[in-house]
Amino acid sequence: MADFLPSRSVLSVCFPGCVLTNGEAEQQRKSKEIDKCLSREKTYVKRLVKILLLGAGESGKSTFLKQMRIIHGQDFDQRAREEFRPTIYSNVIKGMRVLVDAREKLHIPWGDNKNQVHGDKLMAFDTRAPMAAQGMVETRVFLQYLPAIRALWDDSGIQNAYDRRREFQLGESVKYFLDNLDKLGVPDYIPSQQDILLARRPTKGIHEYDFEIKNVPFKMVDVGGQRSERKRWFECFDSVTSILFLVSSSEFDQVLMEDRLTNRLTESLNIFETIVNNRVFSNVSIILFLNKTDLLEEKVQVVSIKDYFLEFEGDPHCLRDVQKFLVECFRGKRRDQQQRPLYHHFTTAINTENIRLVFRDVKDTILHDNLKQLMLQ
């Protein structure tokens, strides 16, 4: 029967458009495969939930991103933990240098004058050395400074300077690490999950983290919050589903590190006003995270917000009154009060369980709003 089948050459004469050479067939197969990939990519992009983390420097964005990694299945393995060790050592040395400098400028006497030698040693630390300039300190170097750091932290003069920390710039995790010097001083010290969450590494550039929840792809983008980094924000605005705007709610009595003049809460309010009234985000859900609730709760007991925001009318030592005032401040920055609702949450970014519960609610809000937008397209 094969003798009666027309040859390939006959077919090509009779039906020139129906016969493909091996090369043409392969090209067509590749073309179809590319079309399938593009179709899948288009579907993925349409389903992708892109969340932008915005806020002033040290508001907790990077800590929140670390929590997403912990909560959604990519915990820090031993190698990743070890990579944070030089950063933590740098945090400790930098923090102690700030305290030694503050003690002198605030004219606080030493508890023990012999500690002047230790203070001088810390102030002579070479911050321009290659690793130190990148915010890292080797174990060998840290252990050389450890006895001096321990003696200084035990000095009443340094403790008094710490008690007046709102008068100068000091990292919020410094006390945690100084209280754990014995653990940090072990030569084979491996940072714990909590150590990593509290380690401070200023965000330079753009950091992304991808994860899935029930087959829905999420992309979380963290951009540096310092003034010098904010010009990069516009690079991330494309195809944004939601913005999580983080505020350090406890910093109502502190000023910016960049200019030493601007109130930190005022700076956050100004940034938020720019974001919430930007037409680019008219269809984007904006969720306000009033972060560092644990520190705010401590602060309202001893510092009156009314001394810094005269319009405050509640009880300055009542956490709920202060939180209500903060929410009203941010809501008041929206020029169009009829626009999409402004969701808010009170958070403590270093508390994994708190962030797990809050993000569960946030995820539902984002997915609900995103579904409505897709239905309108």
Curated annotation (Swiss-Prot):
Residues 47-377 form the G-alpha domain. Residues 347-352 are annotated as: G5 motif. Residues 195-203 are annotated as: G2 motif. GO terms for cellular component: brush border membrane; cytoplasm; heterotrimeric G-protein complex; melanosome; nucleus; postsynapse. Residues 218-227 are annotated as: G3 motif. Palmitoylation is critical for proper membrane localization and signaling. Phosphorylation on Thr-203 by PKA destabilizes the heterotrimer of alpha, beta and gamma, and inhibits Rho activation. Mg(2+) binds at residues 62, 203. Keywords: Cytoplasm, GTP-binding, Lipoprotein, Magnesium, Membrane, Metal-binding, Nucleotide-binding, Nucleus, Palmitate, Phosphoprotein, Transducer. The modification Phosphothreonine is found at residue 203. It comes from the Eukaryota. Residues 287-294 are annotated as: G4 motif. It is found in: Membrane; Melanosome; Cytoplasm; Nucleus. Residues 50-63 are annotated as: G1 motif. A lipid is attached at residues 14, 18 (S-palmitoyl cysteine). Disulfide bonds: none annotated. It is a lipid-anchor. GO terms for molecular function: D5 dopamine receptor binding; G protein activity; G-protein beta/gamma-subunit complex binding; GTP binding; GTPase activity; metal ion binding. Its main location: membrane. GO terms for biological process: adenylate cyclase-activating G protein-coupled receptor signaling pathway; adenylate cyclase-modulating G protein-coupled receptor signaling pathway; angiogenesis; branching involved in blood vessel morphogenesis; cell differentiation; G protein-coupled receptor signaling pathway; in utero embryonic development; intracellular signal transduction. G proteins are composed of 3 units; alpha, beta and gamma. The alpha chain contains the guanine nucleotide binding site. Interacts with UBXD5. Interacts with HAX1. Interacts (in GTP-bound form) with PPP5C (via TPR repeats); activates PPP5C phosphatase activity and translocates PPP5C to the cell membrane. Interacts with RGS22. Interacts with ARHGEF1. Interacts (in GTP-bound form) with ARHGEF11 (via RGS domain). Interacts (in GTP-bound form) with ARHGEF12 (via RGS domain). Interacts (in GTP-bound form) with CTNND1. Interacts with GAS2L2. Interacts with GPR35. Interacts with GPR174. Guanine nucleotide-binding proteins (G proteins) are involved as modulators or transducers in various transmembrane signaling systems. Activates effector molecule RhoA by binding and activating RhoGEFs (ARHGEF1/p115RhoGEF, ARHGEF11/PDZ-RhoGEF and ARHGEF12/LARG). GNA13-dependent Rho signaling subsequently regulates transcription factor AP-1 (activating protein-1). Promotes tumor cell invasion and metastasis by activating RhoA/ROCK signaling pathway. Inhibits CDH1-mediated cell adhesion in process independent from Rho activation. Belongs to the G-alpha family. G(12) subfamily. This is Guanine nucleotide-binding protein subunit alpha-13.
